């Protein structure tokens, strides 16, 4: 009788651990993935920041033409991540980048020191970590990966105590447009806790 009870207890523990494990991973899925994207079509407006829309692009590699402003400024390929950040800066800040081309990771100039002017983008450039904390409106630049060698860009939508919320276009077919990253001050510098983020750009 005692052996049966022990076996049942062990089974109960195993089941409980499985439930806890599933709940943790389900929470991560809910935080990072958007099941409603099953119903989106490419070009649907799915989010916005200060009146500037984020459009659904489906798979990361998808392109449906180039967005060029009425005055001839190259905004980018629809609806890549670069297209959104450039359109945001163009519409909200009335800002045109002197160099309007390049992949996402090319927005960051590795030759510059923290706080120097990035002349290609006509924006101040800060490295991650930086002596200057990120703020709303900053353009985050992410390095490339084996899956995505071109990098990624997003906009800081909001700064809260110890964290930032970003908004992005073309994160992937089922990824959310918003993400939250922790921000910590380490040795006098502000660090966004995401190893892919190499730095950020800011309108001076």
Descriptions of predicted regions:
Residues 105-170:
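...with weaker cross-activation on analogous glycine-rich loops/strands in unrelated enzymes
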Residues 80-87, 135, 155, 196:
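Extracytoplasmic/secreted proteins, especially bacterial periplasmic and envelope-associated proteins
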Residues 2-21, 25:
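N-terminal Sec-pathway targeting helices
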């Amino acid at each position: 009788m005692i052996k049966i009870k022990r076996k049942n207890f062990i089974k109960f523990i195993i089941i409980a651990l499985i439930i806890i494990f599933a709940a943790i991973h389900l929470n991560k899925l809910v935080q990072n993935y958007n099941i409603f994207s099953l119903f989106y079509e490419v070009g649907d407006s799915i989010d916005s920041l200060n009146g500037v829309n984020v459009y659904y692009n489906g798979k990361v590699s998808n392109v449906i033409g180039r967005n060029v402003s009425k005055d001839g400024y190259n905004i980018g390929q629809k609806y890549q991540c670069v297209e959104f950040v450039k359109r945001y800066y163009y519409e909200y800040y009335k800002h045109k980048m002197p160099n309007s081309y390049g992949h996402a990771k090319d927005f960051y100039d590795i030759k510059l020191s923290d706080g120097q002017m990035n002349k290609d983008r006509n924006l101040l450039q800060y490295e991650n970590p930086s002596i200057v904390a990120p703020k709303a409106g900053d353009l985050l630049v992410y390095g490339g990966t084996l899956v995505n060698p071109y990098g990624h860009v997003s906009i800081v939508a909001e700064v809260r105590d110890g964290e930032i919320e970003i908004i992005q276009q073309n994160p992937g077919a089922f990824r959310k447009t918003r993400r939250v990253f922790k921000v910590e001050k380490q040795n006098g510098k502000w660090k966004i806790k995401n190893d892919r983020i190499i730095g950020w750009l800011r309108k001076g």
